[in-house]
Amino acid sequence: MSYTYTLRYVFDPRTNTPEKDEKLLNFVQKAKIDDVAFIINGEELNHSHLTKEETQVWLDAIIPLQKQLAKLGVTTSLNPWTTIMHSDRGFSVNPKIGFNTFVDINGNKAKDMACPADPTWRKYLAQRYAQYASIHPRRLWMEDDFRHYNHTPLKLMCFCDYHMKLYQEKLDKDESREEFVKNMLKPGEPTIERKIYLDQARKEMIENEHLIEEAVHKVSPDTDMGQMTSFPDWHAIEGRDWAKLFDAQAGPGHPRVARPHLPAYNEVAPLIYGRKFEEYSHTTAAFLGPHAELYPELENSMWTPQVKSNTFIAFQIITTALL
């Protein structure tokens, strides 16, 4: 077993300074960091889905740092913070981008969160990932918003008009959204509606991964594609096929690469951590198999020194050996 230490680094290209760059480079050397993954358009800096021009602003700010890191023997990776989008966050899709948003199980339509089968969104996302690949990152990550469930405050997706047409074609009859959802959730033996929903959810995400993988490796053949994962029970709701999904993402000649959720954004009792580690991290590792490259995500929230002790952080790192 070997370890690679990746620093997931948040910065704002609009307010970045040479002094901040110097702090980054000094920290990387002091902490013996192997790889820096630049988070693009992340957290409070997020301003909806980026256009080509907006994306280039981030890449232009990263490229000089990439060159300086390379002189230190440190690789550069990219972590765009959104695919579908975690939640609307007060934004709407830029008309220049113009894809359709998803509709949840209750008929609520998102303002900024993509329909995962929308052809315009699929083309848009593949183009953006090809653009990210243009700087030849070591790894190119997809976020855990690449899922059908947990897009606050909306519920399970997608039941837009386009999806309803797909479902009805497979049913060979017309059903309203309400009727389809009611039958899909009916207790007892799984209904044909449930099978149709899960088959479509599973299929469209694998197709999306394949489109992105092709776009990336056409530009940067040596880049590994990786994906952050959420709780396995969330992914079970959409019928995730872990093997096919991650093989589609990896592409020929590349490993399955994942960033499993590592429990505890705040310090908790070791017993609680252990249970969640088994439930989330260890289960994810089992789904991905013994040859996958795993980069468990160690993160603190909120971002202050008071959230965790150094001892607890060291404890978390040690537990990753169990994966």
At which residue positions do the language-model features occur?
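The substrate-binding groove and active-site-proximal loops of carbohydrate-active enzymes
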Residues: 5-16, 43-59, 107-124, 189-207, ...
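Conserved, mostly hydrophobic/aromatic
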Residues: 125, 132, 140, 216, ...
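N-terminal structural segment of carbohydrate-active enzymes
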Residues: 1-40, 74
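Well-ordered, non-membrane alpha-helical segments in soluble/globular domains
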Residues: 17-26, 52-65, 121-126, 201-213, ...
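Aromatic-lined carbohydrate-recognition surfaces of secreted/lumenal glycan-active proteins
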Residues: 3-14, 75-85, 140-145, 194-240, ...
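Hydrophobic targeting/anchoring helices
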Residues: 31-32, 39-40, 138, 149-150, ...
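Aromatic-lined carbohydrate-binding/catalytic grooves of carbohydrate-active enzymes
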Residues: 24-61, 84-108, 149-152, 156-158, ...
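Active-site-adjacent "subsite" loops/lids of carbohydrate-active enzymes
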Residues: 75-135, 144, 148-150, 163, ...
